[in-house]
């Protein structure tokens, strides 16, 4: 029997409605903050990700799905959304718009070759925002506030916001040198990945899952000790803006993001709920002031974040805040009789759909009893009953499936009667 590829899942009716609910709320929150949707290809040139995400990152070294090469260009399924959005920003010259920052959001599948586990897939789905074109600390705070507000809008309570500053280039270089001096004496005790990163990108050592309990991690120099005055002032303004927005946060100097393009502000939103699992990060993001220029555009700053939808839904389930979703039909037509009954059912079904009702009928030739059972399974609020007698009289029996009450209605008035009864019952 054929199965879905490892690390993927089929979203079936009964489950996909939850996804639609989540996606609709995300679109609503995006609109409140004036973010417009952008849709980019699911594959890009491999070079885009090696240049932007970073050659020493786990994503580039271990997790990318690169397509079999045909022709001169090599393509990779997108492992994250920011690089593609920034590429589209440059390609389509959105930097020429008079109103900056350009505020964009995206939603769609990403692909990473990693070990599947609870809430983590090889085809994952991500929502994210990018605000490109402003270096105002208030934009950093707004982006963090949007992410925080999204989780609160779903009713999640057991979350926390963690922030850090990675500083500007001068600050990062000073911190980089300090990290090399710190880890050099114990390099032989670290994993192979950390050893290879020591001189290329020592900041990534702090994000290592293998060596996170090594004593040297606890005593590693903090980036906050190496921020120059400009970076320190910028971070203080971000925190002041967060205070003004009412966003509670913790400053964690050990927080680094797994992508190389981050500068200044970095943040994560984490779950503190029991039973959520070992991976508690729900959302991550930060500022990337050099990325637009690296991809071939002008020197313009940006900031954004990404939310994994699988992990968001897992958090909603874990805290028990998913609402009961309306998935049933408005009306089901129960019809049995001669040919004219069938044709009348077909005409009435189309009329009801054009009137805006979610409607269906039996296509298996079931008897009345079987059709009523089908209406129950489909959670129909009303059934319209048609037989030879009803059609001959130009009428139908309309049954409220909640109360069991049944009335005769002229065929021409069925839609209006359903609407009247629905409004009266508050359905």
Curated annotation (Swiss-Prot):
Entry keyword Protein biosynthesis: yes
InterPro entries with a match to the protein in the record: aa-tRNA-synth_II, aa-tRNA-synth_II/BPL/LPL, Anticodon-bd, Anticodon-bd_dom_sf, His-tRNA-ligase, HisRS-like_core, HisRS/HisZ, HisRS_anticodon
GO cellular component terms attached to this protein's record: cytoplasm
Primary gene name: hisS
Name this protein carries in UniProt: Histidine--tRNA ligase
Description of how the protein assembles with itself and partners: Homodimer.
NCBIfam families with a match to the protein in the record: hisS
Organism of derivation: Exiguobacterium sp. (strain ATCC BAA-1283 / AT1b)
Lineage, highest ranks first: Bacteria, Bacillati, Bacillota, Bacilli, Bacillales
Example GO biological process: histidyl-tRNA aminoacylation
UniProt keywords, alphabetically: Aminoacyl-tRNA synthetase, ATP-binding, Cytoplasm, Ligase, Nucleotide-binding, Protein biosynthesis
């Amino acid at each position: 029997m054929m199965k879905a590829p490892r690390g993927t899942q089929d979203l079936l009716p009964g489950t996909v409605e939850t996804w639609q609910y989540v996606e609709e709320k995300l679109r609503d929150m995006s609109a409140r903050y004036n973010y417009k949707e952008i849709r980019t290809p699911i594959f890009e040139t491999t070079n885009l990700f090696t240049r932007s995400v970073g050659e020493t990152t786990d994503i580039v070294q271990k997790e990318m799905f690169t397509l079999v090469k045909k022709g001169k260009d090599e393509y990779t399924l997108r492992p994250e959304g920011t690089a593609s959005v920034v590429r589209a920003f440059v390609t389509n010259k959105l930097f020429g718009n008079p109103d900056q920052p350009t505020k964009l959001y995206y939603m769609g599948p990403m692909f990473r070759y990693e070990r599947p586990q609870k809430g983590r897939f090889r085809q994952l789905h991500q929502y994210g925002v990018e605000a490109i074109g402003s270096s105002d600390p208030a934009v950093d705070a707004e982006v963090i506030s949007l992410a925080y507000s999204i989780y609160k809008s779903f009713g999640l309570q057991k979350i926390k916001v963690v922030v850090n500053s990675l500083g500007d280039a001068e600050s990062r270089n000073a911190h980089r040198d300090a990290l090399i001096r710190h880890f050099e004496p114990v390099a032989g005790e670290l994993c192979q990945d950390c050893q290879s990163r020591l001189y290329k990108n020592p900041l990534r050592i702090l994000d290592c899952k293998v060596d996170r309990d090594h004593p040297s991690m606890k005593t590693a120099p903090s980036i906050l000790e190496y921020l120059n005055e400009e970076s320190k002032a910028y971070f203080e303004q971000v925190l002041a803006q967060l205070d003004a927005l009412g966003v509670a946060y913790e400053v964690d100097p050990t927080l680094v993001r797994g992508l190389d393009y981050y500068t200044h502000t970095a943040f994560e939103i984490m779950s503190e709920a029991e039973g959520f699992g070992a991976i508690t990060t729900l959302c991550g993001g930060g500022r990337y002031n050099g990325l637009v220029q690296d991809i071939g555009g002008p020197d313009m700053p940006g900031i954004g974040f990404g939310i994994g939808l699988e992990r968001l839904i897992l958090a909603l389930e874990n805290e028990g805040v998913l609402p009961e979703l309306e998935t049933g039909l408005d009306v089901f037509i129960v019809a049995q009789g001669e040919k004219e009954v069938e044709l009348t059912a077909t005409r009435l079904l189309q009329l009801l759909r054009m009137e805006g009702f979610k409607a269906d009928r039996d296509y298996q030739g079931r008897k009345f009893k079987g059709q009523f059972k089908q209406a129950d399974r489909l959670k129909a609020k009303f059934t319209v009953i048609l037989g030879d007698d009803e059609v001959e009289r130009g009428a139908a029996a309309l049954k409220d499936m909640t109360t069991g009450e049944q009335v005769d209605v002229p065929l021409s008035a069925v839609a209006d009667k359903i609407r009247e009864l629905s409004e009266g019952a508050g359905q």
